[in-house]
């Protein structure tokens, strides 16, 4: 019994000393966003509409940013949904710093992935390794509901800059604005020149 009491006393002293000492924070910890668990219904999230751009003056597709550094605080991935209207497309582009998984919930599309082209239908999954060219054309009679997951944040910042929140005035981007946004976010997305 005598051995146990000194051990308990030493432990109690160590606990008191450790709880009264200020914790040193690492510089890296200051930049980690606060994560928040989320449960979102189909149409919940940050709803946005792509602004028109040179050669495409009409407002673009509707998309929803569901999980990213701003929504949920994820520092590791981005999850979004988008509707590709009948006759619409995702223009040829690549993501230098992130893999992407594209899941087409509905519709019919012609997908160009690297050197491969294929017609796919609702329920199809497309894995797009970083730096691989991708484009999608809606060739069906209905809108395509698409889900995209990126392995690293970045692209969502470009999407925010080139869109407006649903309900806001949607003014097309000027050529200068579009070029500046593409240059600023070239680490996350590069579009093929027409």
Predicted regions and their residues:
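Ligand-binding loop in jelly-roll beta-barrel domains
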Residues: 74, 110, 130-156
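Bacterial N-terminal signal peptides that target proteins for export
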Residues: 1-9
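Conserved short histidine dyad/triad with adjacent acidic residue
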Residues: 63-67, 80-95
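Bacterial N-terminal signal peptides
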Residues: 8-18
